[in-house]
Amino acid sequence: LVTYLQEVRKHQGFMVPGPAQAAAVAALSDQTHVDIQRDRYRRRLESLVEVMAAVGVDVPMPGGGFYLWAPAPGGDAWGFARRLADEVGMVASPGEFFGEAGSDHVRLAAVAGDERIELLRDRVGI
């Protein structure tokens, strides 16, 4: 049985090839890309917080991730999402998409490129 399993293992690709292992070591040993991406998302989130302040909504910076949860004025997340789309050109998801607890919020993702976020800033006059 052991001989058979050794033969099966040899042909099943259970071993990661040496070049792939070396590439993984190189990719994981330098965290510069993590710092760059974290800073990029932080800047985008800060800009979105300012955009929301310009439309009269106070949104705290998140402790992690790249989403902002903005309270919907009057608790109307659908109406607020429409308002952001119509007045600012910003896409927001009504919080109820993500569970009942978010029903009076909208979720904003800081995934648009910097130039798109700058356009939002221009639209609200900041």
Give names to the regions the model predicted.
Residues 55-59, 91-96:
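A short linear hydrophobic-aromatic micro-motif
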Residues 1-42:
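Conserved core segment of the aminotransferase class I/II
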Residues 83-92, 98-126:
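PLP-dependent enzyme catalytic core of the Aspartate aminotransferase-like
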Residues 2, 20-21, 77, 81, ...:
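A general structural signal for well-ordered alpha-helical segments in protein cores
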Residues 12-15, 24, 47-48, 68-85:
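Accessory recognition modules or surfaces
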Residues 21, 25, 41-49, 59-71, ...:
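Conserved glycine-rich beta-strand-loop-beta hairpin in the small C-terminal domain of fold type I
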Residues 29, 73, 111-113:
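Residue-level recognition of strand-loop junctions within catalytic nucleotide-signaling folds
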